[in-house]
Regions:
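Conserved acetyl-CoA binding element of GNAT-fold acetyltransferases
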Residues: 88-102, 154-157
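Conserved N-terminal entry element of GNAT/NAT acetyltransferase domains
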Residues: 1-17, 25
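Conserved GNAT-fold acetyl-CoA-binding loop/helix
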Residues: 27-50
């Protein structure tokens, strides 16, 4: 995919059905990694929730679209104000979800979405960007490391 054939923009209500399709794709990746946690063929967000999220001031939903207007990927991010007695106060962006259609992965779509999110975070005065990646999702871990992300903390679990 050529970079000039791709546009990254804020999501619109008309994009929701395609976003839901892509949410199903990413859920199925997670379900393969952790069938004990994820149900097959479900989505993290339903269409009404995405519609509501589009109106929130602390939520950023980006889509990458091809020349024909087909949504090839999305990025959900939330803006947070970090405060605490022992924490440096700052604004932060948390990338909640990023998905590229399986048919066009490794073609620069994810990179373009991430670059736009970084630009957006800078314009909004964020000091950092955080995200979570499921253990075993080596493609995602490699992608984020190659784009400057490094471990900040570890979440450990003990199955009972």
């Amino acid at each position: 995919m050529e970079a000039e054939e791709l546009t990254v923009r804020f999501a619109k209500e008309a994009d929701i059905p395609r976003i839901v399709e892509l949410l199903r794709q990413v859920n199925n990746v997670h379900q393969q990694l952790r069938p004990d946690l994820f149900l097959p063929d479900h989505t993290k967000y339903a269409a009404p929730e995405i519609k509501r999220m589009l109106r929130l001031h602390d939520t950023v939903i980006l889509v990458a679209v091809d020349a024909q207007g087909l949504v090839l990927g999305y990025l959900f991010a939330f803006l947070k104000q970090i405060r605490g007695d022992n924490l440096v106060s700052r604004r932060s962006m948390h990338i909640d979800d990023l998905c590229v259609d399986a048919a066009v992965r490794h073609s620069g779509v994810g990179r373009r979405l991430l670059e736009q999110a970084v630009e957006c975070a800078g314009q909004l005065g964020c000091a950092d960007i955080t995200l979570n990646v499921w253990e075993g999702n080596e493609d995602a871990i490699s992608f984020y490391r190659n784009h400057g992300f490094a471990p900040k903390s570890h979440i450990l679990e003990m199955k009972l």
